[in-house]
From Swiss-Prot:
It comes from Kluyveromyces lactis (strain ATCC 8585 / CBS 2359 / DSM 70799 / NBRC 1267 / NRRL Y-1140 / WM37) (Yeast). Residues 4-150 form the UBC core domain. Catalyzes the covalent attachment of ubiquitin to other proteins. Plays a role in transcription regulation by catalyzing the monoubiquitination of histone H2B to form H2BK123ub1. H2BK123ub1 gives a specific tag for epigenetic transcriptional activation and is also a prerequisite for H3K4me and H3K79me formation. Also involved in postreplication repair of UV-damaged DNA, in N-end rule-dependent protein degradation and in sporulation. The lineage of its organism: Eukaryota, Fungi, Dikarya, Ascomycota, Saccharomycotina. One of its GO terms (biological process) is protein ubiquitination. It comes from the Eukaryota. Its EC number is 2.3.2.23. Belongs to the ubiquitin-conjugating enzyme family. This is Ubiquitin-conjugating enzyme E2 2. Pathway: Protein modification; protein ubiquitination.
């Protein structure tokens, strides 16, 4: 069934395929355009550099008038990410407008890697380390980057087994 939300998501998908912003990728599940898997590559010159962080985006029929539910599936140590992977980002809450699309959502999340907002912490420990003990913060982030690589290797091994 074609609805305004589904048509808009197909346009978002076309844009992601044709002109994906650097360091982000996303696509809907093969059997459900309302649920997307996404990945953000940690930006250069940040502690997250080269990490591969997976996310899940869940849309409902009110999209684009209502933001999707977005959460990290990958482990994330960041001042604005809750332990369950949910993200504290104004455009996913009170500053949402229908002009945002999947690409702009992901680039906004990616920008948090460069510029965390410790004034609005979802993870108090990460915010405190970011503000007061930067070297410890960087060490913890780099541990999650390495974990993201390990998770990717496990996923690739699982895919290889599925193909056999």
């Amino acid at each position: 069934m074609s609805t305004p939300a589904r048509r808009r998501l197909m346009r978002d998908f076309k844009r992601m395929k044709e002109d994906s912003p650097p360091g982000v990728s996303a696509s809907p599940l093969p059997d459900n355009v309302m649920i997307w898997n996404a990945m953000i590559i940690g930006p250069a010159d940040t502690p997250y550099e080269d990490g591969t962080f997976r996310l899940l985006l869940e849309f409902d029929e009110e999209y684009p008038n209502k933001p999707p539910h977005v959460k990290f599936l990958s482990e994330m140590f960041h001042p604005n990410v809750y332990a369950n992977g949910e993200i504290c980002l104004d455009i996913l809450q009170n500053r949402w407008t229908p002009t945002y699309d999947v690409a702009s959502i992901l680039t906004s999340i990616q920008s948090l890697f460069n510029d965390p907002n410790p004034a609005s912490p979802a993870n108090v420990e990460a915010a405190t380390l970011f503000q007061d003990h930067k070297s410890q913060y960087v060490k913890r982030v780099k541990e999650t980057v390495e974990k993201s690589w390990e998770d990717d290797m496990e996923d690739m091994a699982d895919e290889d087994e599925d193909e056999e």
